[in-house]
Amino acid sequence: MSHHKKRVYPQAQAQYGQSATPLQQPAQLVPPQDPAAAGMSYAQMGMPPQGAAAPMGQPQFLTPAQEQLHQQIDQAATSMNDMHLHNVPLVDPNAYMQQQVPAQAGMPFQQQQQPLPAQVYGQPSAAMGQNMRPMNQLYPIDLLTELPPPITDLTLPPPPLVIPPEKMLVPSEVSNASPDYIRSTLNAVPKNSSLLKKSKLPFGLVIRPYQHLYDDIDPPPLNEDGLIVRCRRCRSYMNPFITFIEQGRRWRCNFCRLANDVPMQMDQTDPNDPKSRYDRNEIKCAVMEYMAPKEYTLRQPPPATYCFLVDVSQASIKSGLLATTINTLLQNLDSIPNHDERTRISILCVDNAIHYFKIPLDSDNNEGSTDQINMMDIADLEEPFLPRPNSMVVSLKACRQNIESLLTKIPQIFQSNLITSFALGPALKSAYHLIGGVGGKIIVVSGTLPNLGIGKLQRRNESGVVNTSKETAQLLSCQDSFYKNFTIDCSKVQITVDLFLASEDYMDVASLSNLSRFTAGQTHFYPGFSGKNPNDIVKFSTEFAKHISMDLCMETVMRARGSTGLRMSRFYGHFFNRSSDLCAFSTMPRDQSYLFEVNVDESIMTEYCYIQVAVLLSLNNSQRRIRIITLAMPTTESLAEVYASADQLAIASFYNSKAVEKALNSSLDEARVLINKSVQDILATYKKEIVVSNTAGGAPLRLCANLRMFPLLMHSLTKHMAFRSGIVPSDHRASALNILESLPLKYLIKNIYPDVYSLHDMADEAGLPLQTEDGETTATVVLPQPLNATSSLFERYGLYLIDNGNELFLWMGGDAVPALVFDVFGTQDIFDIPIGKQEIPVVENSEFNQRVRNIINQLRNHDDIITYQSLYIVRGASLSEPVNHASAREVATLRLWASSTLVEDKILNNESYREFLQIMKARISK
């Protein structure tokens, strides 16, 4: 318990307590994966303690039915007579190790591997038999009686992947891939396409190969011995779900069932560090990395190369964008990844000409050389040439001082520039020729619409087109084919384009974002940017600094393989789809996610299926690596089991990607129809196929508990700026669509359904550092419990914080008591508090003020995404509010914007969530 006294605001507390509705607690959807959490020991589960090997000395016995099943699988796996795959006995791996390594006299062999008093692997039991596998169970609920919906479900893990320990060589928590790396929409896979089609549930994978901006945070285990074992036929990598056969001399692939030879090197260990094959990372860990040998490398891993293409036209200078960019670069030169000290830098300034800079070595300064920093202007935009290419892309280490010197001079050089033109297209081509030999990143910082040379864009006429069927074709399409065709050239030479667009004017984000979409980059949009607003500078500088300091890998390709019957069919995210199943990333960022759609092409005959994602990459430390992510999933012929194992967050991500594609290629109306139809189809199928009896009229709206947030997420998605009907500036809508198609899952969910916190009555410990059980203080701040995103829970005197992942809104109720206003803002008059994009002032001797600022800082603290949320302070309506207050118009706009994030409410022409459910109920009852 906290010893901090809770500040009580009498009027607010009494009224809030009378009207508050306690949050509903989510039902326990499935048995916990951790036996300890269920009050069971690993021995009771038939599992060894964590970190221990499988039980040893117990050969695996098969029933006649099991032997027949293995024979059928073997015979179907190959038509090659000389492989002798059928009738191969399955042998327990520890039995093999016991035969190979004799125990020392008087000492038991590996005491930690002695058999536990548990079921012997391979012998079916009531819980683990072929026909009685443990599976997730359905928990039916009525959506209409669960209002407001229990939003704590949004933070629950997905339904467990129920894989018995005998299916793993070394059972442990890391033997199957964590949902942080890969999540399947279905954690029980239909055995045939007809069942999948009947379910109306999508089958897809949400993949995030990297979890942090910086690779030194929680890296997966690495194999450095150069031994990479792969299946001869399907080319899958050895993983925790293969089986050793023929006394361990061969291994059976869990993807295609082929028997492969085991390399002798697997059992050759360092005498000073003896290990068995079961200690190898590929056997123990579903997520791991290999140091790639030469055969995986076409050329020496290239140096990380950054080409900064900076807008120096009049608009960029006036807005303060140029000065902000240069200052941020100056402060973060040492943060740019340079692990192998080969990182190279180039800087181009662009207006109606391209300004190159020749940067000499720092050593030349010390030797009295006359070689100086020179600027070379190229005005021929049709065929721009490179005046001195060898001295314009320079080593960050060898030229560090001169790069800094150049950056300090650039604002002075262009401070009086009156040119309004910005030749982005020719500048991109010049940068392409400059770094095309090795590849790298082109980072564009622009405050002006490209209006000169190839790729010239014009302002589109939005009047009469916004919120019509023509919006996609005329406002969200690419205005000039250059921005798509150029990405093809970039992909061939391993170049990524990132965009930082900051302007008070139209930027045509819809056209420009194609540069990053197809080169594995990102588009960052800062509407209304002004260097006079410190909050704009902080947001841009923070995100730009985190972006250029983020670790990256070059020359990257990613492929997902499925076991027999599974095939990857569609791919969503920012990359170049080089072939039918190969996704190419010139550079792979650390803050994006990807979605692959999976088809069940043929009937799956096995009880378990597998997905393996392989990422081949070059790191900034001159290493070529392969990251492997392996996922095992049970299969089923039961529609109820499919529904019981559906992952509502992954399904929401799937339909989000589909809707973004539909909005960009067809129309926003079709995207909204797709979103709503996804809910209707699932509800109708559940009612028809799962519910035992149907009653007319007052029938409940049934769904399983693990999917009860799905209708809420889809309804909220239709109110997102990317999809909602109404007048939305095309730049804002295009930027919103761009964000949705690449956000990691947890931030996507927050973007769709914002977190809302009540601050005026938060718990005593909220806003204070978290304390461990030992009483030690951590850097993590305790957050209040979130509320449902509806104004019906807002009190007129309360203080609320809304976090949608992009912005923070601090809503101060118009009738808040003076004590609360003073504790937060240091003034008792609510009409004196700052409004709009502001920061909360520091109020001395106010613990409550400190706690509120701590919460805001905690919400902004990310090590896996570069976003920094600006804070908007909103004053709620009040009967005592002056009619002609100076900020009345701004306040009204802010209230409308903040209210649009309360997605359970009726917003403009969109119905409330309760009304949405009633509409769905009426549709499926027809």
From Swiss-Prot:
Topology versus the membrane: Peripheral membrane protein
Listed Low complexity bias regions: 20-54
Query: Quick one: which residues bind Zn(2+)?
Result: C231, C234, C253, C256
- Tell me the InterPro entries matching this sequence: ADF-H/Gelsolin-like_dom_sf (IPR029006), Gelsolin-like_dom (IPR007123), Gelsolin-like_dom_sf (IPR036180), Sec23/24_helical_dom (IPR006900), Sec23/24_helical_dom_sf (IPR036175), Sec23/24_trunk_dom (IPR006896), Sec23_24_beta_S (IPR012990), SEC23_SEC24_subfamily (IPR050550)
Q: Where does the protein principally reside? A: cytoplasm
Q: Write out the GO biological process terms.
A: COPII-coated vesicle cargo loading; intracellular protein transport
Q: What is this protein called?
A: Protein transport protein SEC24-2
Q: Which organism is it from?
A: Saccharomyces uvarum (strain ATCC 76518 / CBS 7001 / CLIB 283 / NBRC 10550 / MCYC 623 / NCYC 2669 / NRRL Y-11845) (Yeast)
